[in-house]
Amino acid sequence: MRNKAFLSALALIIISVLFISCGKSTKPKKQIDTKPVSVKQFDTPPGADPSVSAEQGGEGFKGEGWETKTDYNILGDPKAIKGGPFNMRIPDFPNTLRIYGKDANSYVNNLMENMVYESLLSTDPVTEDWIPGLATHWKVSEDKKQFWFRINPNARWADGKPVVAEDVVATWKLLVDPGILEAYSNILYGTYEQPVAESKYIVSVKTKELNWRQFLYFAGSMR
């Protein structure tokens, strides 16, 4: 009987301790520094390169014969308060921090890619129409096998250097390089001819096959 009473008392003590430990924590919350981080090295003036003509996508570009959109919906609320912590669940741990190549297809890598790099075009979250991204204007040939994009002259890399048409060409070359060990990208982007930087801000590409998805893939994923 004594042993039973002792065990009962011990059980009550343990349960009480567990309840107390599960109570409110007095540990202060960790303060997160949300100050902006900058790696800017170059002070490139805003706007287009003065040496590039309007016809070649520079200052004064009219966009006649091109498509664009200035009135469109965006995700999120523009009135949202900036700054502060943002908690989210990450379901996997990346094997690499590359956004292309072997083992790059993970939740974290895709998240970082969309946060760091902007695609040529995006889609309106309500109407699903094409809207500007890295490119302000776009154009499709009559046979639907050649596409043109005009890079936003105000686009800048994190270090301050301007984004130019040659950067799009460089991305395509990377995606078709067998050395990245990503057969899917090699095959998909191999269905296009090498893009051409027609000027500092205008890049064009021809597709090897007639398919409505070809514009979708290039405009929506090329960065």
Language-model features, listed with the residues they occupy:
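N-terminal pre-domain segments of enzymes
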Residues: 28-81
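C-terminal motif of bacterial Sec signal peptides marking the signal peptidase cleavage site
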Residues: 18-21
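Aromatic- and charge-enriched surface segment that lines or borders ligand/interaction sites
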Residues: 136-181, 204-206
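Extracytoplasmic
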Residues: 81-85, 115, 133-135, 142-146, ...
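Bacterial N-terminal signal peptides that target proteins for export
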Residues: 1-9
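N-terminal lobe/hinge region of extracytoplasmic solute-binding protein
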Residues: 53-74, 84-142, 173
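Surface-exposed binding/hinge segments that line
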Residues: 186-223
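Bacterial signal peptide processing site
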Residues: 23-25
